[in-house]
A protein has these predicted regions:
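Non-catalytic alpha-helical scaffolds and adjoining flexible linkers that form interface surfaces
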Residues: 1-19, 24-136, 142-154, 162-293
C-alpha cells in the first residue's frame, strides 16, 4: 500500500457515476486512478480529487494495469484563492497539462512535484493577498462614505490603518513570488529540469556576462545577444520580452508577463516539439484578452 501526497492534474468522466483522475504524486510520478462513484454527492473523495487540489492519497499500485484503484484521499489544500483568479487559474492549467503530456512517465518526479506544489502555493498566496488588499480598500472607502462631511480623526486613523495593513500584506510576499513571475519562473525551472538549460546572463556570441537586458533573444537556440554583438542589426525579440526575461533573472516584477511567458513557451516548444497540442494555452490566450494582458 502506497501513501503519498498528490496534485490532481486532470479529471474526466468515465461513466455516469465515475471519474478517471490523473495525479502527480510525490513518490510515484504520474498515476491514473479510476474513481468509481466519484460523481455522487456522498462520495468520500469529493473535493480531494478536484483538478489542482493537493491531497494525500492511499492506493495499492498494480504494475499490470494503467488504472489504479484509490483507497483513500484526504484533501490538504484546495487552493481556493487561486480558483477565484481567472488568469492565474488559466496559467496553472497550462502548467498541469504540460506536466501531464511531457513529463517522463513511469518514474518518480519529486522535483516536478515540489516545483508544481510551490507554484500553486504562490499563486494561491498572491491571489489571496491581492483579494484581501482589494477588500480592505473597499471597506475603507465604505467607512469614509458613512462619515459626515467633516470626517473625524478616528475615521481617518481607521482608513490609514486599513491601507497600511493592505500594503503590509502585499509586502510580505517574497520578491520571487510576484504574481507576474510565477508562471515564467515555472517555465524557466522546467527548462532546467528537463535538460534544456537557458542561460539568461551570458551573450551567446561573445560569452560576456550581461549587465542589462539583452539586445535580442532567439527561442530556437535559447541564445541571448548583447548590444555590442547585435550592432546595427534589428532585434527580433520585443523590448517587453527582453526586459521581462531580465526581470525574471533578477527576481523583479515582470511588467508584461505574457511576452516573457510566450518566449519561454516558444523555447520549450522548439526543444520538446510539442507534438501533442496544449489545449489550455488557447484558454490562457482568451483569458489574457479578457484582462488586456
Amino acid at each position: 500500500m502506497i501513501k503519498t501526497r498528490a496534485i490532481v492534474l486532470h479529471r474526466f468522466p468515465y461513466s455516469d457515476s465515475s471519474f478517471i483522475v490523473k495525479v502527480l504524486t510525490e513518490e510515484s510520478g504520474i498515476v491514473s486512478f479510476i474513481v468509481k462513484g466519484g460523481k455522487k454527492k456522498e462520495s468520500p473523495f469529493r473535493g480531494a480529487l478536484d483538478p489542482l487540489a493537493l491531497s494525500e492519497v492511499v492506493f495499492r499500485q498494480n504494475p499490470n494495469t494503467e488504472l489504479q484503484f484509490i483507497k483513500e484521499a484526504t484533501l490538504l489544500d484546495w487552493h481556493k484563492d487561486l480558483r477565484n483568479d481567472l488568469l492565474s487559474l488559466a496559467k496553472a492549467q497550462v502548467i498541469t497539462e504540460m506536466i501531464l503530456r511531457y513529463a517522463p512517465q513511469g518514474v518518480p518526479l519529486q522535483e516536478e512535484f515540489e516545483r508544481l506544489e510551490q507554484s500553486l502555493r504562490e499563486f494561491n498566496e498572491t491571489c489571496g493577498s491581492s483579494a484581501n488588499a482589494a477588500n480592505a480598500a473597499t471597506s475603507s472607502s465604505m467607512q469614509n462614505a458613512e462619515q459626515n462631511a467633516t470626517p473625524s480623526l478616528n475615521a481617518s486613523a481607521t482608513s490609514a490603518s486599513a491601507i497600511a495593513n493592505s500594503a503590509e500584506s502585499l509586502s510580505a510576499i517574497p520578491a520571487s513570488a510576484h504574481k507576474s513571475n510565477i508562471f515564467a519562473r515555472w517555465l524557466l525551472d522546467t527548462c532546467d529540469m528537463w535538460g534544456y538549460n537557458l542561460d539568461l546572463e551570458t551573450c551567446s556570441r561573445c560569452g560576456h556576462t550581461l549587465d542589462k537586458p539583452a539586445a535580442d533573444f532567439f527561442p530556437e537556440t535559447g541564445g541571448f545577444i548583447c548590444h555590442a554583438c547585435l550592432g546595427v542589426e534589428t532585434p527580433r525579440a520585443r523590448t517587453e520580452t527582453l526586459q521581462g526575461l531580465w526581470a525574471l533573472h533578477n527576481g523583479d516584477k515582470i511588467e508584461h508577463p505574457e511576452f516573457t511567458e510566450n518566449a519561454l513557451l516558444a523555447y520549450l516548444r522548439h526543444h520538446i516539439g510539442f507534438l501533442k497540442e496544449i489545449h489550455s494555452i488557447k484558454f490562457l490566450n482568451e483569458t489574457r484578452k479578457l484582462f488586456g494582458k
